Amino acid sequence: MRGLVFLVAACILAGTVGCGGTRGEAPKAYRRGESGPNPMPEEAPWKEADITLPPYPRDQDLILFEPRGQTTNRFYVDGSSLTVDPDRVIRFSLVIRSAEGARTVSYSGVNCKTAGWKDYAFGPDGDRWERVADPQWREIRDQQMNNHQYTLASEFFCYGGIFSGGPTGDAKSIVRHLKHPPTPDARVPARYN
Protein backbone atom coordinates (compact mmCIF):
# COMPACT_ATOMS: atom_id res chain seq x y z
CA MET A 1 0.00 0.00 0.00
CA ARG A 2 2.84 2.36 0.88
CA GLY A 3 4.40 1.65 -2.47
CA LEU A 4 1.16 2.56 -4.27
CA VAL A 5 0.90 5.91 -2.44
CA PHE A 6 4.53 6.64 -3.28
CA LEU A 7 3.95 5.74 -6.94
CA VAL A 8 0.86 8.01 -7.19
CA ALA A 9 2.73 10.90 -5.52
CA ALA A 10 5.69 10.43 -7.87
CA CYS A 11 3.41 10.47 -10.92
CA ILE A 12 1.66 13.66 -9.77
CA LEU A 13 4.99 15.37 -9.08
CA ALA A 14 6.39 14.30 -12.45
CA GLY A 15 3.29 15.60 -14.20
CA THR A 16 3.50 19.05 -12.62
CA VAL A 17 7.22 19.40 -13.32
CA GLY A 18 6.67 18.77 -17.00
CA CYS A 19 3.88 21.34 -17.30
CA GLY A 20 6.13 24.39 -17.40
CA GLY A 21 7.63 23.84 -20.80
CA THR A 22 10.79 22.20 -22.03
CA ARG A 23 12.92 20.80 -19.21
CA GLY A 24 11.10 22.58 -16.39
CA GLU A 25 11.17 26.06 -18.01
CA ALA A 26 8.23 28.41 -17.49
CA PRO A 27 5.96 28.79 -20.52
CA LYS A 28 6.74 31.80 -22.69
CA ALA A 29 4.23 34.65 -22.53
CA TYR A 30 3.60 35.93 -26.03
CA ARG A 31 2.91 39.59 -26.62
CA ARG A 32 0.50 41.06 -29.13
CA GLY A 33 1.91 40.59 -32.63
CA GLU A 34 4.54 37.96 -31.69
CA SER A 35 4.48 34.56 -33.30
CA GLY A 36 4.23 31.40 -31.28
CA PRO A 37 1.89 28.51 -30.60
CA ASN A 38 -1.00 30.82 -29.55
CA PRO A 39 0.01 34.37 -30.52
CA MET A 40 -2.26 37.29 -29.65
CA PRO A 41 -3.62 38.94 -32.79
CA GLU A 42 -2.45 42.43 -33.70
CA GLU A 43 -4.87 45.06 -32.47
CA ALA A 44 -6.13 47.17 -35.34
CA PRO A 45 -5.33 50.86 -34.99
CA TRP A 46 -8.29 52.90 -33.79
CA LYS A 47 -10.05 54.89 -36.50
CA GLU A 48 -12.64 57.51 -35.74
CA ALA A 49 -15.96 57.05 -37.50
CA ASP A 50 -17.27 59.62 -39.95
CA ILE A 51 -20.02 61.65 -38.33
CA THR A 52 -23.33 62.98 -39.54
CA LEU A 53 -24.72 65.89 -37.57
CA PRO A 54 -28.08 65.14 -35.95
CA PRO A 55 -31.15 67.38 -36.19
CA TYR A 56 -30.86 70.51 -34.09
CA PRO A 57 -31.97 69.87 -30.46
CA ARG A 58 -35.62 70.40 -29.53
CA ASP A 59 -36.61 71.37 -25.98
CA GLN A 60 -38.85 68.31 -25.53
CA ASP A 61 -35.83 65.98 -26.07
CA LEU A 62 -33.56 67.65 -23.50
CA ILE A 63 -32.56 65.74 -20.35
CA LEU A 64 -31.33 67.86 -17.44
CA PHE A 65 -28.29 66.62 -15.52
CA GLU A 66 -26.38 68.21 -12.66
CA PRO A 67 -22.61 68.36 -12.98
CA ARG A 68 -20.28 68.17 -10.02
CA GLY A 69 -18.67 71.40 -8.93
CA GLN A 70 -19.95 74.94 -8.84
CA THR A 71 -22.08 76.43 -11.58
CA THR A 72 -25.11 78.64 -12.11
CA ASN A 73 -25.68 77.11 -15.56
CA ARG A 74 -28.16 74.37 -16.42
CA PHE A 75 -26.90 71.42 -18.51
CA TYR A 76 -28.91 69.20 -20.85
CA VAL A 77 -28.21 66.26 -23.15
CA ASP A 78 -30.46 65.83 -26.19
CA GLY A 79 -31.55 62.22 -25.69
CA SER A 80 -32.66 61.83 -29.31
CA SER A 81 -29.16 62.65 -30.58
CA LEU A 82 -27.16 60.33 -28.31
CA THR A 83 -25.38 57.47 -30.10
CA VAL A 84 -22.74 54.88 -29.24
CA ASP A 85 -20.96 54.50 -32.55
CA PRO A 86 -18.89 51.57 -33.88
CA ASP A 87 -15.68 53.39 -32.89
CA ARG A 88 -16.99 53.27 -29.27
CA VAL A 89 -17.35 57.07 -29.09
CA ILE A 90 -20.50 58.39 -27.45
CA ARG A 91 -21.82 61.35 -29.46
CA PHE A 92 -24.60 63.70 -28.41
CA SER A 93 -25.94 67.25 -28.49
CA LEU A 94 -25.31 69.32 -25.38
CA VAL A 95 -27.29 72.42 -24.40
CA ILE A 96 -26.04 74.80 -21.71
CA ARG A 97 -28.30 77.58 -20.42
CA SER A 98 -26.86 80.37 -18.32
CA ALA A 99 -28.70 81.98 -15.41
CA GLU A 100 -29.15 85.05 -17.64
CA GLY A 101 -30.85 82.99 -20.37
CA ALA A 102 -28.01 82.63 -22.89
CA ARG A 103 -27.93 79.26 -24.64
CA THR A 104 -24.88 77.37 -25.96
CA VAL A 105 -25.44 74.31 -28.13
CA SER A 106 -22.77 71.83 -29.23
CA TYR A 107 -22.50 68.41 -30.83
CA SER A 108 -19.76 66.56 -28.95
CA GLY A 109 -18.16 63.16 -28.43
CA VAL A 110 -16.64 61.30 -25.47
CA ASN A 111 -14.03 58.56 -25.86
CA CYS A 112 -14.06 56.54 -22.62
CA LYS A 113 -10.83 54.70 -23.36
CA THR A 114 -8.75 57.88 -23.67
CA ALA A 115 -10.89 60.15 -21.47
CA GLY A 116 -11.18 62.46 -24.47
CA TRP A 117 -13.78 65.09 -25.41
CA LYS A 118 -14.32 66.56 -28.86
CA ASP A 119 -16.70 69.27 -30.09
CA TYR A 120 -17.75 68.63 -33.71
CA ALA A 121 -20.20 71.51 -34.19
CA PHE A 122 -21.83 74.46 -32.46
CA GLY A 123 -25.25 76.05 -32.91
CA PRO A 124 -24.44 79.77 -32.92
CA ASP A 125 -27.69 81.12 -34.35
CA GLY A 126 -30.21 78.93 -32.57
CA ASP A 127 -31.47 76.57 -35.26
CA ARG A 128 -28.61 75.16 -37.34
CA TRP A 129 -25.19 73.58 -36.87
CA GLU A 130 -21.87 75.13 -37.78
CA ARG A 131 -19.07 72.54 -37.99
CA VAL A 132 -15.80 73.08 -36.12
CA ALA A 133 -13.08 73.56 -38.76
CA ASP A 134 -10.52 71.16 -37.26
CA PRO A 135 -12.00 69.39 -34.23
CA GLN A 136 -9.39 68.01 -31.81
CA TRP A 137 -9.61 65.58 -28.89
CA ARG A 138 -9.00 67.20 -25.50
CA GLU A 139 -8.46 65.54 -22.15
CA ILE A 140 -11.42 65.46 -19.78
CA ARG A 141 -10.44 66.89 -16.40
CA ASP A 142 -12.13 67.09 -13.03
CA GLN A 143 -12.64 70.84 -12.50
CA GLN A 144 -14.30 73.06 -9.91
CA MET A 145 -16.46 75.08 -12.33
CA ASN A 146 -18.81 73.83 -15.07
CA ASN A 147 -17.67 70.25 -14.67
CA HIS A 148 -20.16 68.82 -17.18
CA GLN A 149 -17.64 66.91 -19.31
CA TYR A 150 -16.20 65.02 -16.35
CA THR A 151 -19.65 64.36 -14.89
CA LEU A 152 -21.03 62.91 -18.13
CA ALA A 153 -17.98 60.69 -18.69
CA SER A 154 -17.49 59.48 -15.14
CA GLU A 155 -21.11 59.12 -13.99
CA PHE A 156 -23.17 58.37 -17.10
CA PHE A 157 -21.15 57.35 -20.15
CA CYS A 158 -18.08 55.31 -19.20
CA TYR A 159 -18.24 51.92 -17.46
CA GLY A 160 -16.20 52.11 -14.27
CA GLY A 161 -15.40 55.79 -14.85
CA ILE A 162 -13.13 57.40 -17.42
CA PHE A 163 -10.09 55.58 -18.84
CA SER A 164 -12.24 52.46 -18.57
CA GLY A 165 -12.17 51.46 -22.18
CA GLY A 166 -15.85 51.35 -22.92
CA PRO A 167 -19.30 52.86 -22.80
CA THR A 168 -21.68 51.78 -20.05
CA GLY A 169 -24.16 50.40 -22.54
CA ASP A 170 -26.03 51.17 -25.72
CA ALA A 171 -27.59 54.57 -26.43
CA LYS A 172 -31.02 53.63 -25.03
CA SER A 173 -29.59 52.45 -21.72
CA ILE A 174 -27.45 55.59 -21.35
CA VAL A 175 -30.48 57.81 -22.05
CA ARG A 176 -32.50 55.83 -19.50
CA HIS A 177 -29.70 56.33 -16.96
CA LEU A 178 -29.63 60.09 -17.67
CA LYS A 179 -33.39 60.28 -17.11
CA HIS A 180 -33.19 58.24 -13.89
CA PRO A 181 -29.76 58.92 -12.39
CA PRO A 182 -28.51 57.05 -9.34
CA THR A 183 -28.45 58.66 -5.94
CA PRO A 184 -25.79 61.36 -5.48
CA ASP A 185 -23.60 58.87 -3.59
CA ALA A 186 -23.46 56.46 -6.54
CA ARG A 187 -20.76 58.19 -8.55
CA VAL A 188 -19.33 55.40 -10.73
CA PRO A 189 -21.86 53.56 -12.89
CA ALA A 190 -22.08 49.85 -13.33
CA ARG A 191 -22.65 48.43 -16.78
CA TYR A 192 -26.35 48.77 -17.57
CA ASN A 193 -28.13 47.37 -20.59
Predicted regions and their residues:
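Bacterial N-terminal signal peptides that target proteins for export
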Residues: 1-7
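C-terminal motif of bacterial Sec signal peptides marking the signal peptidase cleavage site
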Residues: 15-18
